[in-house]
Amino acid sequence: MSAIRRRWRFTGTVQGVGFRYYARAAALHLGLTGWVANNWDGSVTLEAQGERAALDALVPLIERSNRWARIENVEVTPLP
């Protein structure tokens, strides 16, 4: 299987609550590579690459892992 890439933009209470730490831990647990960063507007952007099943499992794992974050909206963009 070939790797695919996606970018997510999370809004809500996602800064100052360990969101990037838990997102990175979840991605590593699933065997994904990529990056995560805070944005000036209070949102967080995450880009990851890997197998489709792992990418599909990433957001639910982040939501279960971090009890302090409150994700209000997620925008997903497939990348080439």
Question: What spans do the regions from the language model cover?
Answer:
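Intrinsically disordered, low-complexity, mixed-charge
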Residues: M1-P80
